[in-house]
Amino acid sequence: MGNLIAVRKGTGGGPAVVFDAHLDTVFQPGLKIKATVRNGRVHAPGVGDDTRNIEALLATMRALNAANIRTKGDLIFVFTVEEETNFKGVKHFVEENKGKIDHYIALDGGYEGFTYAGIGINWYRHHFIGPGGHTRSRTPPYSASLPLARSISRIYELKVPTSPPSNLNIGMLGGSEVVNAKASDGWFTVDLRSTSNEIIGSLEKQIAAILEEEAKRTGMSMKTEMISTSPAAVIPGHRDSQLVKIAEAVHRALGFDPPITNTGSNNSSVALLAGISSISTGAGPCADAHALTENCEIEPLYLGIKKILLLELALAGLE
């Protein structure tokens, strides 16, 4: 699979606690990356998501060994692959370790606070299929880009709730590969997100109705591909769980007034969907995630490392 796993055995009698930082980034292979330091920040694509958390997790491992600290429970350090887009690495790890994990901490995201639940995320690719042809051909005078454009305009007029937190995005679209051809396949993607599976379902139905109407209006057919689906990850009562209470206490002990939210979107969701108590947090404040201008503050990382170390000791238990 490609996951890298290290187990620091406890002396016994404590929980099995997983700390996860993902190895992949959203950037394509071949991108030339050179980190630069300016005004107390390090700048490089992927430096925040998720390099800073890999660095912090490795630092805590070295610190535990250097101080010869023993914990009652096992500390399992997992560096996962393919977090971006499909959670493939964490799904494999969780599936292989069913019933063996007590707490799962995904290091990915916020610095001052943490998440205890995950949003639902559904990705689709919608296609309008038409006859195509040359610009001057005798096929209908429009290409599949027409119902595509009309649909996108109407979809963006839908009311997307802000409470509970929900999002809609059309990120990709395509059609003919040349200027002088009518598109025979006009397609676009939709990214739906919400902490409510019911809201995602409602938006799905509204979008499906729009697509059907626009396909009928132009005499074309349509099809939908499901690219990826991940339901909202919520464990009833988890806000008051032992893990969340300990995580909040650790943050407050370090001087944070932590925002505690239910809008996670990372490996933590996979653990939650498997019924494992899980949170996600991060080791340092960063900006411009998923952009070439991504950057992180350097100085706060030291406090972030302390936070992760305290979480490890508080959850696994000191011998």
Over which residues does each language-model region extend?
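Acidic/His- and Gly-rich active-site-bordering loop/insert found
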Residues: 1-43
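Acidic/histidine-rich catalytic neighborhood of metal-dependent amide-processing enzymes
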Residues: 41-42, 46-123, 161, 170, ...
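A structural signal for isolated positions on well-ordered beta-strands in alpha/beta enzyme cores
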Residues: 18, 76-78, 223
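Glycine/charged-rich beta-loop-alpha catalytic/anionic-binding loops adjacent to active sites
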Residues: 33-46, 129-132, 289-290
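Acidic-glycine-rich active-site phosphate/pyrophosphate-binding loop
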Residues: 24-38, 101, 116-127, 279-280
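FAD-binding subdomain of flavoenzyme oxidoreductases
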Residues: 127, 136-139
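Metal-dependent amide/peptide-bond hydrolase catalytic core
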Residues: 116, 133-136, 144-319
